[in-house]
């Protein structure tokens, strides 16, 4: 990124009205002063970003710079100033593709073919440049202008990733529920084919106005997707040509290795021989259904925006549901990203195990490195008093733990980790300690513990714990 003293955006661009808003950003119309050209400036408040969000911003800018295609919203400039980062994009004024379709007097299968062709052209360009979008959905399909026949533009590369060739790997759980592929839901390695699955979902909606996979219960929705459980019900599908259904089937193939790719899809007769293969019949039922589909999407978006604005939640905290919680697909148009939650939870379990190992070994030096100097605790040895600092624990390390040469083995049972933002976490678990008593008889102690961790300078430190049950020192 450029140095913080840079004022290039302020010097070269003039800002105008607001076009949209996100959690940490605002989009405003701007004009490049020396040429009078209009653009859209995405203004990100970098003071509010975590280190991980900074990395994501840089990743998005890098990816957008790579992509230059008539069906992709183009990034023209990326400028860092004090407290703000500016991404200068094409100004697209035609609104969402799906909103435009419902305003048309005439809409046919051939029109749907032309729409998906442009989407496939944008996806093909991404894939040829080693980019997987990961969040293809109606909200990210815009029109260049309000003119008839305006180009479809793919937008929002916030979840996009770079891949090497046909590399498949686990890049994290990311996307929007109704458009997620079976391999992502199975937590399998994935790559470019996830975008083709989403294209299949979009094409299905373009033809009948409702999605192939839908359920109020998110768990059941995911089961449908993993099973590839969609069909072409009568009467609405009776008037769709077999070639259109064939392309959908090739896109919604469960096995990603057998799924059609973007280059192949562009060669499909329903796309490249549109005038003779795709039906020209007006599809009023599709338009009517699509109106309802759009209305539901907008309502969900408005509810989420209101919650964010009035309750000051981050989108992330709203969307990371505890395991097993059912979620209605009322939020199925909302992007979710769960890239490394599992890894971060494992990190907390590991550092907790290291702390317990230091206790078992009577290693006060190792213990102090893992604990905050102002560590607070409730523990049986303190008789219900809140203890602060290390002196209380030092006594046990110096007079009991370090002098005990009995073999001790500790097991952590049922650890539950709650991630609290980027740099805090709470873990609750049962601790079983096995040891030999003074008579050499095997004994087991149990305690129930909760520990609060805080990450400072990249290092996790225990700032508070609460223990009930047995004291930790074998007797």
From Swiss-Prot:
InterPro entries: Ca/CaM-dep_prot_kinase-assoc, Kinase-like_dom_sf, NTF2-like_dom_sf, Prot_kinase_dom, Protein_kinase_ATP_BS, Ser/Thr_kinase_AS
Modified residues (Phosphoserine): 314, 317
Organism: Xenopus laevis (African clawed frog)
Bridged cysteine pairs (disulfide): none
Active site: 135
Residues of the Protein kinase domain: 13-271
Described function: CaM-kinase II (CAMK2) is a prominent kinase in the central nervous system.
Pfam families assigned: CaMKII_AD (PF08332), Pkinase (PF00069)
Annotated GO CC locations: cytoplasm; neuron projection; postsynaptic density
Descriptive protein name: Calcium/calmodulin-dependent protein kinase type II delta chain
Regulation of activity: Autophosphorylation of CAMK2 plays an important role in the regulation of the kinase activity.
Signal peptide per UniProt: none
Catalytic activity: L-seryl-[protein] + ATP = O-phospho-L-seryl-[protein] + ADP + H(+); L-threonyl-[protein] + ATP = O-phospho-L-threonyl-[protein] + ADP + H(+)
Keyword annotations from UniProtKB, A to Z: ATP-binding, Calmodulin-binding, Kinase, Nucleotide-binding, Phosphoprotein, Serine/threonine-protein kinase, Transferase
Positions of post-translational Phosphothreonine modification: 286, 335
Subunit structure: CAMK2 is composed of four different chains: alpha, beta, gamma, and delta. The different isoforms assemble into homo- or heteromultimeric holoenzymes composed of 8 to 12 subunits.
Biological processes per GO annotation: regulation of neuronal synaptic plasticity; regulation of protein localization to plasma membrane
Family membership: Belongs to the protein kinase superfamily. CAMK Ser/Thr protein kinase family. CaMK subfamily.
GO function term, MF aspect, one: calcium/calmodulin-dependent protein kinase activity
Binding site for ATP: 19-27, 42
EC number of this enzyme: 2.7.11.17
């Amino acid at each position: 990124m450029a140095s913080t003293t840079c004022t290039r955006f302020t010097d070269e661009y003039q800002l105008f009205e607001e076009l949209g808003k996100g959690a940490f950003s605002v989009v405003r119309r701007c004009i490049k002063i020396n040429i009078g050209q209009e653009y859209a400036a995405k203004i990100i408040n970098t003071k509010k970003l975590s280190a991980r969000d900074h990395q994501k911003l840089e990743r998005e800018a890098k990816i957008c710079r790579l992509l230059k295609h008539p069906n992709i919203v183009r990034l023209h400039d990326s400028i860092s100033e004090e407290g703000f980062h500016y991404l200068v994009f094409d100004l697209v004024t035609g609104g969402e593709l799906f909103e435009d379709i419902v305003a048309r007097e005439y809409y046919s299968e051939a029109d749907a073919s032309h729409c998906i062709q442009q989407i496939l052209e944008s996806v093909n360009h991404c894939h040829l440049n080693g980019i997987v979008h990961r969040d293809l959905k109606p909200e990210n399909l815009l029109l260049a202008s309000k003119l008839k026949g305006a180009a479809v533009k793919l937008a929002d590369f916030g979840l996009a990733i770079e891949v090497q060739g046909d590399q498949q790997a686990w890049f994290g759980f990311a996307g929007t529920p109704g458009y997620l592929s079976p391999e992502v839901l199975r937590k399998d390695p994935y790559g470019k084919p996830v975008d083709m699955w989403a294209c299949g979902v979009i094409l299905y909606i373009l033809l009948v106005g409702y999605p192939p996979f839908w359920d109020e219960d998110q768990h059941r929705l995911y089961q449908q997707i993993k099973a590839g459980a969609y069909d072409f019900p009568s009467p609405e599908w009776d008037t769709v040509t077999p070639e259109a259904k064939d392309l959908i089937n090739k896109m919604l193939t469960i096995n990603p290795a057998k799924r059609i790719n973007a280059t192949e899809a562009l060669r499909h007769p329903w796309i490249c021989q549109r005038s003779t293969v795709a039906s020209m019949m007006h599809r009023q039922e599709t338009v009517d259904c699509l109106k309802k589909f759009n209305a539901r999407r907008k309502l969900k978006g408005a509810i989420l925006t209101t919650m964010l604005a009035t309750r000051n939640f981050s989108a992330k905290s709203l969307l990371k549901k505890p395991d097993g919680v059912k979620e209605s697909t009322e939020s199925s148009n909302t992007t979710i990203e769960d890239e490394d939650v599992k890894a971060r939870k494992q990190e907390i379990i590991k550092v907790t195990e290291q702390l317990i190992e230091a206790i078992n070994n009577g290693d006060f030096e190792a213990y102090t490195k893992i604990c905050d100097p102002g560590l607070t605790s409730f523990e049986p040895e303190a008789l219900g008093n809140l203890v602060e600092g290390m002196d209380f624990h030092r006594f046990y390390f110096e007079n009991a733990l370090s002098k005990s040469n009995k073999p001790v083995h500790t097991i952590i049972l049922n650890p539950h980790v709650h991630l609290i933002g980027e740099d805090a976490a709470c873990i609750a678990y049962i601790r079983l300690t096995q040891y030999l008593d003074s008579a050499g008889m095997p004994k087991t102690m149990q305690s129930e513990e909760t520990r609060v961790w805080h990450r400072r300078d990249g290092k996790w430190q225990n700032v508070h714990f609460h223990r009930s049950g047995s004291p930790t020192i074998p007797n």
